[in-house]
C-alpha cells in the first residue's frame, strides 16, 4: 500500500474533493491541516516540486503529485490506482 500524505486547510473545498476521492478508494492517508501554521506550510512548500503554496498538496510515496486537479486527472486517466498500489 502506498504512503499517501495530503496538506489541507479545514474548510477548503478542493481539499475535501481530494480526500473524498481517496476515501472512495479506501486509501489511508496522513492529513496535515495547516490552518494558520506557517511552519507547516513552509514544510509543504519545501517538499513540493513547484513552490506551490496552495492546498491541497498531495504526496504519494514521498513523490509530489500536486493538488486536487492533478489527482483528479490521474483518476480520469486511469493512472491513480497504480500509484496507490
Give the role of each language-model region:
Residues 1-31:
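Local sequence-structure signature of Cys/Sec-based thiol-disulfide redox active-site neighborhoods
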Residues 13, 39, 66:
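Short alpha-helical
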Residues 29-41:
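Thiol-based oxidoreductase modules, predominantly thioredoxin-like and allied folds used
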Residues 30, 52, 82-83:
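A local structural micro-motif
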Residues 43-48:
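Short amphipathic alpha-helix with an adjacent loop that forms part of the alpha/beta core around
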Residues 49-59, 68-69:
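Structural micro-motif
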Residues 60-85:
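Non-catalytic, surface beta->alpha helical segment in thiol-disulfide oxidoreductase systems
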Amino acid at each position: 500500500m502506498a504512503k499517501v500524505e495530503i496538506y489541507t486547510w479545514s474548510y477548503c473545498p478542493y481539499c475535501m474533493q481530494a480526500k473524498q476521492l481517496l476515501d472512495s478508494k479506501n486509501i489511508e492517508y496522513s492529513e496535515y491541516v495547516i490552518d494558520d501554521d506557517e511552519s507547516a506550510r513552509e514544510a509543504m512548500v519545501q517538499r513540493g516540486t513547484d513552490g506551490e503554496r496552495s492546498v491541497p498538496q498531495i504526496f504519494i510515496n514521498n513523490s509530489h503529485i500536486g493538488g486536487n486537479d492533478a489527482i483528479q486527472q490521474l483518476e480520469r486517466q486511469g493512472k491513480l490506482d497504480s500509484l496507490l498500489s
